[in-house]
């Protein structure tokens, strides 16, 4: 026994002092000077079943592990963080978690990258109301505060606009990034079906003297239909919240904001899968997370990413 213990002690000591091995799974950009951002589609499929929640932990752990390798500057999430915002009665045909359990699970997954890389969110219809965006109530600002991420996000946060409950929230917020080889970038997040006030705030921000020369990325949960619906811009959502005057669906966002502001160069949305279209000569395409958009420029790309409804698409980012 003493010999065995001595052998194990020696082995552990050798392991402790041995140089780190080169990992076979390290991903690096082809250009060492390149920068990246991670786009996460709607994660509700990960959190509505407890058995799927560890998959989303793997997603955020992979991000944390590759921040330096890929020079990741931010993580952008298109919302629908939970399946239902505020419900305790379980419909076991579609979930086995209460709303509180889902909010705590998705918050826990993102806590893995708190203080490591900023994560920005545009909440979706599932993040509001009782079950189906019946009203403007959301638990998002209770779980996703600026303080939880600390300086890693506060140094980028340059403006915000109150949500529909009148609360300070990162639902409507603007973040400034400086990447090597790029103009300065302004990323604007939005609440689901943003209010007229939030839309006007974003417009004023984009054309202001301070940000008029920035490349603007606007992220909103809902903007386009899927390819089965001809990739059209959503004319009007059918949720009670979106029926209220002053809340804007896709066509209203195009008319009031995207078509009016030239430095909005990229719009990111979730909600539907496989969207792609050309609008007034502006490129609007990306079929799946792994799609390659050919013969297109960066100008006015509209990406629509949606993870598999049942299990979150196995952890792809």
Predicted regions and their residues:
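Extended active-site neighborhood of metal-dependent phosphoesterases/phosphodiesterases
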Residues: 87-201, 210-211, 283-308
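Bacterial Sec-dependent N-terminal signal peptides
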Residues: 1-22
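Active-site-proximal segments of metal-dependent phosphoesterases and phosphodiesterases across multiple
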Residues: 32, 92-99, 197-200, 209-265
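Active-site neighborhood of phospho(di)ester-bond hydrolases with catalytic His/Asp-centered motifs
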Residues: 39-41, 73-80, 115-124, 190, ...
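A general structural motif
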Residues: 34, 71-72, 116, 183-185, ...
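Conserved beta-sheet core of the metallophosphoesterase superfamily
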Residues: 244-317
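N-terminal active-site segment of His-dependent metallophosphoesterases
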Residues: 20-97
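Active-site environment of divalent metal-dependent phosphoester hydrolases
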Residues: 46-48, 83-86, 123-132, 170-173, ...
């Amino acid at each position: 026994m003493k010999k065995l213990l001595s052998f194990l002690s020696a082995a552990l000591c050798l392991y402790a002092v041995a140089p780190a091995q080169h990992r076979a799974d390290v991903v690096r950009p082809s250009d060492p000077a390149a920068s990246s951002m991670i786009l996460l589609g709607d994660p509700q499929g990960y959190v509505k079943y407890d058995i799927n929640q560890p998959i989303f932990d793997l997603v955020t752990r992979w991000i944390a592990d590759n921040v330096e390798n890929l020079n990741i500057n931010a993580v952008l999430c298109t919302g629908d963080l939970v399946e239902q915002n505020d419900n305790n009665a379980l419909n076991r045909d579609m979930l086995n978690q209460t709303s509180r359990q889902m909010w705590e699970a998705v918050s826990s997954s993102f806590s893995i990258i708190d203080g490591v890389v900023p994560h920005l969110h545009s909440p979706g219809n599932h993040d509001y109301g009782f079950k189906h965006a019946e009203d403007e109530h959301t638990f998002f600002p209770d779980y996703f505060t600026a303080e939880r991420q600390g300086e890693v996000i506060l140094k980028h946060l340059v403006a915000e606009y109150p949500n529909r409950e009148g609360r300070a929230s990162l639902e409507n917020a603007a973040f400034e990034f400086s990447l090597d080889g790029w103009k300065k970038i302004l990323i604007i997040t939005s609440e689901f079906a943003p209010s007229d006030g939030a839309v006007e705030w974003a417009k004023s921000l984009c054309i202001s003297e301070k940000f008029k020369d920035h490349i603007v990325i606007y992220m909103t949960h809902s903007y386009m239909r899927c390819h089965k619906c001809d990739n059209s811009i959503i004319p009007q959502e059918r949720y009670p919240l979106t029926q209220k005057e002053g809340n804007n669906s896709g066509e209203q966002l195009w008319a009031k904001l995207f078509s009016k502001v030239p430095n909005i160069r990229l719009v990111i949305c979730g909600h539907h899968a496989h969207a792609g279209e050309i609008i007034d000569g502006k490129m609007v395409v990306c079929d799946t997370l792994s799609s390659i958009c050919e013969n297109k420029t960066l100008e006015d790309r509209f990406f629509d990413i949606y993870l598999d409804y049942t299990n979150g698409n196995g952890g792809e980012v």
